[in-house]
Regions:
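Bacterial N-terminal signal peptides
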Residues: 10-19
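Beta-propeller-forming repeat regions
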Residues: 25-304
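Intrinsically disordered, low-complexity regions enriched in Ser/Pro/Gly/Gln/His and often acidic
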Residues: 2-3, 15, 251
Length: 304
């Protein structure tokens, strides 16, 4: 499935969009104790933001805004030295400890400062992760790696063809670049899935972005199972300069995978970095192997 949009979802996100969508319900405002929560691990493991709580296999967003709600969340989840499992490759890879809450501080949003202690993961640049207090299935092994040279070659042929199909010139396709390309195994079956974020620069005032999930079959053939193409021009960007997208702002990027509903298939968590906050998305594999977006929320930080 391929979608094309003129104005990307993540550049002009409204900061009022703090509740979940796709039939998910807001998390209850009162609680006797911490509920299972999934966090995005950002800035090299030095900061977290909440993505959703988990209840009966469903995701729900927290509503921030009222001071009492914000303080309640911080007291439940952001107490100094509180510890969470750090998820990398769909399995636990060390821990993440809270240093201090940023809720109520200038541009702190719903975040907290953290310290990560990983086993294998190297959280640098746009390599991010998840953290959670949910019960983790310790019987499944972590799987997250860079694609092989052959795999990358096959994927980039698909990416180039998709950009051309969407109307990009041959010269523009030659400017092919990426922010992320990662191999994962969502079903623990030894057949990798690939999550990628590619872009081209047809002109100095235009960028074209492609986010995708690709599959590899038993014969080694790779094909897209989901992709989203966006055309971005200066008027679509809050800063008015498309070059700001070259750093990763405005792109949908992988966080990690986690089987939050215990159905044996890891869901894919992504982030869309915007100028005033972050968009978060979750994809779930359905019948027939198709991927669909089952959850979406926005975390406002401060005005641009």
């Amino acid at each position: 499935m391929t979608n094309t949009t003129k104005t990307p979802w993540l550049i002009v996100a409204a900061f009022l969009f703090t509740a979940s969508v796709y039939g998910q319900k807001p998390a209850p405002k009162s609680s006797a104790g911490p509920k299972p929560v999934i966090f995005a691990v950002l800035d090299g493991g030095k900061r977290v933001e909440p993505i959703a709580s988990v209840s009966a296999g469903k995701l729900a967003a927290y509503e921030f805004g009222e001071e009492v709600q914000n303080k309640a969340f911080a007291s439940l989840y952001y107490k100094p030295k509180s510890s969470y499992s750090l998820i990398f490759g769909g399995a636990a890879d060390g821990t993440l400890a809270i240093v201090k809450s940023n809720i109520g501080t200038e541009c702190g949003g719903a975040s907290a400062d953290t310290v990560s202690r990983t086993v294998k993961a190297k959280l640098t640049g746009l390599v991010m992760a998840l953290a959670t207090n949910t019960k983790i299935n310790t019987s499944t092994a972590a799987y997250r790696r860079k694609p092989s040279v052959e795999e990358r070659r096959g994927i980039e042929k698909l990416v180039s063809a998709e950009f051309a199909k969407q109307g990009a010139s041959a010269a523009a396709v030659k400017t092919l670049r990426y922010h992320n390309l990662t191999a994962l195994d969502v079903e623990d079956d030894g057949q990798p899935e690939f999550i990628g974020s590619y872009w081209i620069a047809p002109t100095s005032g235009e960028r074209r972005l492609l986010f995708f999930i690709a599959e590899q079959d038993a014969n080694g053939k790779i094909q897209f199972s989901m992709s989203e193409h966006s055309v971005v021009k200066a008027d679509d960007v809050m800063s008015g300069d498309v070059k700001d997208l070259d750093t990763g702002v405005g792109h949908e990027l992988l966080l990690d995978v986690l089987d939050y509903d215990a159905d044996g298939v890891r869901e894919i968590f992504t982030i869309g970095r915007a100028f005033e906050g972050n968009n978060y998305y979750v994809y779930k594999r359905g019948e027939g192997g198709n991927w669909s977006k089952v959850y979406e929320t926005y975390s406002y930080r401060c005005a641009f």
